[in-house]
């Protein structure tokens, strides 16, 4: 470690000489170095300031500020001198400091759990890309999905003066939501079941999707229906389960429901084992997401020697990359990831400020059914 190599020559001196053979200290660590007779001279260095640029260019501090402010008036010769000085010194505008003076930081917090799952990672990619395109910077806060961890994450977002937070996991307490709004922070809840006023809720019409997949199963001749879910119990997962059960009940049909573990592949295998060992073995299983569906299909084929879709029809949700693989060829619903990201960022960029007295705002999007080979007659 660096502190193990440094032997201070003077406790009060900002310059320390250390004898090493081949040590390079990168400039981006905010330290510059030079070699002097086989020694490395380490000098602590703060970021280049606008005042330093002004002095080098021979202009005023305000001229530097105007040069780096879009639309501001500055003479061409002055701009040229400032830009040359900035390039020579390695100066970059401190957008954080500038934003705080304008009461905006440009920071948007993404509060999320299970970032490694295919759907969640694709959503993070889309949201961060749209934020960057709009001139915002994303600050990712990883939570454990519990509501308490979401509350802590939002308090952290307030401390960093974030302009907004986009919540992909968990649900904040009403008092925390109001605290965010009172501090001028806008909120977006994605696939969260919450009727608190102020935030924008972006949800899918999960119940409508469940009704469509039920119709597909019935047309394929399926009569013994099942739903495979996890024990996570997120609003979107439960909406799909309840929508499927309700749609079946409307046709006088029952649904065998099994829940286990997380929304992952291994949980799907366990759920399939429970469902397929029942006396009334299902001939159609709607899975809360694609990872569960992949586990269900593999268990059905390898443990129970069943043919998909000839003996068992399976459908999933999310349209992750694996769903299109020939080994699964899974019929599923595609989450409108780009539309979700676009609408979330557009809401944050729209005129107006956060208001704890605002009305409930909900945007419901459509999930596209992607037909593949896991349902007969698709």
Regions found by a protein language model. Name each.
Residues 133-134, 183, 247-254, 278-280, ...:
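Short helix-capping segments at alpha-helix termini
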Residues 3-45, 103-215, 219, 276-277:
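Alpha-helical recognition/docking segments in bacterial nutrient-uptake
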Residues 95, 113-122, 140-149, 192, ...:
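Hinge/beta->alpha junction and helix N-cap segments in small-molecule ligand-binding domains
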Residues 86, 131, 247-248, 276, ...:
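Conserved hydrophobic residues forming the short capping helix/wall of the S-adenosyl-L-methionine
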Residues 60, 106, 163, 222-224, ...:
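Short acidic/polar active-site loop segments enriched in Thr and Asp
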Residues 54, 167, 286-288:
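Short beta-strand scaffold positions
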Residues 10-21, 35-36, 278-378:
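Flexible loop/turn connectors
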Residues 5-104:
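N-terminal helix-turn-helix DNA-binding module of bacterial transcription factors
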């Amino acid at each position: 470690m660096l502190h193990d190599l440094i032997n201070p020559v003077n406790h009060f001196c900002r310059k320390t000489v250390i004898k090493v053979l081949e040590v390079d200290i990168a400039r981006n660590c905010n330290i510059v170095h030079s070699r002097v007779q086989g020694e490395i001279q380490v000098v602590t260095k703060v970021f280049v300031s606008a005042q330093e640029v002004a002095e080098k260019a021979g202009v005023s501090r305000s001229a530097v500020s105007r040069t780096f402010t879009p639309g501001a008036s500055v003479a061409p010769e002055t701009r040229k001198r400032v830009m040359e000085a900035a390039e020579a010194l390695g100066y970059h505008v401190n957008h954080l400091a500038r934003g705080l003076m304008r009461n905006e930081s440009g920071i948007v917090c993404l509060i999320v759990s299970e970032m490694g799952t295919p759907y969640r990672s694709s959503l993070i990619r889309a949201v961060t890309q749209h934020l960057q395109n709009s001139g915002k910077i994303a600050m990712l806060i990883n939570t454990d999905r519990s509501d308490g961890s979401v509350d802590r994450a939002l308090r952290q977002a307030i401390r960093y003066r974030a302009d907004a937070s986009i919540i992909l996991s968990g649900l904040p307490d009403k008092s925390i939501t109001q605290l965010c709004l009172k501090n001028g922070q806008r909120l977006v809840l994605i696939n969260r079941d919450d009727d608190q006023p102020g935030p924008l809720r972006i949800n899918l019409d999960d119940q409508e999707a469940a009704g469509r997949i039920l119709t597909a199963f019935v047309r394929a001749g399926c009569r013994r229906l099942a739903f495979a879910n996890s024990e996570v119990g997120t609003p979107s997962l439960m909406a799909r389960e309840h929508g499927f059960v309700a749609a079946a009940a409307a046709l006088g049909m029952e649904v065998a429901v099994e829940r286990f573990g997380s929304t992952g592949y291994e949980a799907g295998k366990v759920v399939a084992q429970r469902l397929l060992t029942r006396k009334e073995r299902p001939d159609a299983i709607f899975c809360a997401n694609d990872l569960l569906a992949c586990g269900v299909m593999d268990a059905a084929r390898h443990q129970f020697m069943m043919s998909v879709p000839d003996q068992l029809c399976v459908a999933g949700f999310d349209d992750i990359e694996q769903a299109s693989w020939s080994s699964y060829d899974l019929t599923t619903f595609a989450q409108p990831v780009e539309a979700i990201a676009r609408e979330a960022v557009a809401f944050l960029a729209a005129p107006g400020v956060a208001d704890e007295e605002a009305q409930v705002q909900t945007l419901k999007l459509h999930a596209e059914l992607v037909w593949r080979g896991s349902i007969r007659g698709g």
